[in-house]
Amino acid sequence: MEMDSNTYNWYSTLLKPSWSPPAWIFGPVWTVLYAIIAVTYGTVFYKVYTKELPLIIALPFVLNLIFNFSFTYFQFGLKNNLLASIDILLILATLIWALYSLYAVSLTNHLSTGAPSLTWIIYANIPYVLWVSFATILQLTITFLNK
């Protein structure tokens, strides 16, 4: 969702903490993160498709993607900080769930069959986890400051 001038004006009037990053940083950060997400999801869905991973492993990844794309609509489309806060908490929760599930299944498969471990995906997603953790704290703070 592209920010029009009304949305930009609305967002710029919100109270933000002093440690809030400048607006220009979000584009480059999300570009890198979406590349990581694409590789991660592509790998996971391919492994599910080829039956190297169980179908259920895709659930937290699908939910994470839905919540991730919903955030922009809640925050900038509806201009609703509370819904955006709930959504980003769900993004963080499903991300942790997805990576933990992948780790558990990968470890079990590796130990029982000798299949290669997929823990590289967890390591590749550390920037995503860190950014979403930071963004969650930022969004909750913005919501609190503007209640």
Label each PLM-derived region with a short phrase.
Residues 1-28, 50-54:
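Interfacial loop at the N-terminal end of multi-pass membrane proteins
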Residues 39-43, 74, 93-105:
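Alpha-helical transmembrane segments in multipass membrane proteins, preferentially the mid-helix core
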Residues 42-76:
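Helix-adjacent hinge/juxtasegments
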Residues 61-71, 84-99, 125-133:
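Hydrophobic alpha-helical segments of small multi-pass membrane proteins
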Residues 21-36, 79-91:
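Membrane-interface loop-to-helix entry segments
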Residues 71-83, 103:
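Membrane-interface helix caps and helix-loop-helix hairpins in membrane proteins
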Residues 137-147:
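Juxtamembrane boundary at the C-terminal end of a transmembrane helix
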Residues 100-130:
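Interfacial loop-to-transmembrane junctions
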